[in-house]
Amino acid sequence: MSIFIDRETKVCVQGITGSEGSFWTKHMIDLGTDVICGVTPGKEGQMVEGIPVYHSVKNALKHHKIDATMLFVPPKMTKDAVFEALEAGIKKIVTIADGIPLHEMMEIRQRALEENAFVVGGNTSGVISPKEAMMGSFPHWIERVYKKGSIGVMTRSGSLTNEVTAMIVEAGYGVSSLIGVGGDPVPGARFAEFLPLYQKDPETKAVVIIGELGGTMEEEVAETILKGTFTKPLVAFLGGRTAPKGQKMGHAGAIITGGKGSVQNKIEMLEKAGAKVADRPRKVGKLLEELGVTKD
């Protein structure tokens, strides 16, 4: 069972007529995603990959039931697009935009919490359940990376996602649902908020998190395990072990500040909670074996 999106999820694409939107809409459909409509202001009546385009989400809802929406819009337009979707009652939103203004991302997260909705991103590749559906920009056709299986994956990094997931597959496992929470300082939703969904999913035997220095998301995962609300095996790989304090490393969120966010502190907390931490991607599969997770 996919935890965020599956073949039954009715998906809208906001920004569908742009080059990124149209390109990835085709790949989303190719994988099996049920994309039913698109939204681009001023483009109502057009068709993209056989999908009708509407001026607004409100107009689209007059003709379609929408479960989730995928945003391919510029950073400075993201807040308005997310709020439009939330006001329409859509509870699952993915935005890949990199560089959403920090204060606007804070507003987005607060509004999503108030609406009991999930906003995945920004600065993410999105969400994918291999062989089922995706919302985002994953190279899903690479079988050695995106093979269906029983390992849930959450990640803050795009490039590390491909590397670690490839190692999971090489070790004899596959992926149930992969969620890229994004690499910005304020994501729409955090690792720990998705753990209850993986806990309830009978097809997910274990979870792998791909984290990095900065922020406190990995520490929140450790706290969730210690509280006993997540009980499945968990393995982590954390990038940035040798990064100097105060130096941003690739992502805006990958920075150690105020004595918090160091990889060493994250490792200590995760291991104290009973999770395993791999010191390199290739060891993730071995640690899953050590935790008794059966192969797919």
From Swiss-Prot:
Give me the reactions it catalyses.
sulfoacetate + ATP + CoA = sulfoacetyl-CoA + ADP + phosphate
Q: Name one Pfam family in it.
A: CoA_binding
What does the record give as the function of this protein? Part of a variant of the sulfo-TK pathway, a D-sulfoquinovose degradation pathway that produces sulfoacetate. Hydrolyzes sulfoacetyl-coenzyme A (sulfoacetyl-CoA) to produce sulfoacetate and CoA coupled with the phosphorylation of ADP to generate ATP. Cannot use succinate, acetate or 3-hydroxypropionate, and shows only residual activities with malonate and 3-sulfopropanoate.
Determine if Methyltransferase is one of this entry's keywords: no
Q: Which UniProt keywords apply?
A: Carbohydrate metabolism, Ligase, Nucleotide-binding
Q: What is this protein called?
A: ADP-forming sulfoacetate-CoA ligase subunit SqwL
Q: Which residues bind CoA?
A: 17-20, 43, 96-98
What are this entry's molecular-function GO terms? nucleotide binding; succinate-CoA ligase (ADP-forming) activity; succinate-CoA ligase (GDP-forming) activity
Active-site positions on this chain: 251 (tele-phosphohistidine intermediate)
Q: Which residues cross the membrane?
A: none
Tell me the GO BP annotations in alphabetical order. tricarboxylic acid cycle
The family assignment reads: Belongs to the succinate/malate CoA ligase alpha subunit family.
pH dependence per the UniProt record? Optimum pH is 7.5.
GO CC terms, sorted: succinate-CoA ligase complex (ADP-forming)
Q: Which domain of life is it from?
A: Bacteria
Q: Which NCBIfam families match?
A: PRK05678.1
Q: How does it assemble?
A: Forms a complex with SqwK.
What is this enzyme's EC? 6.2.1.-
Keyword Ligase set for record: yes
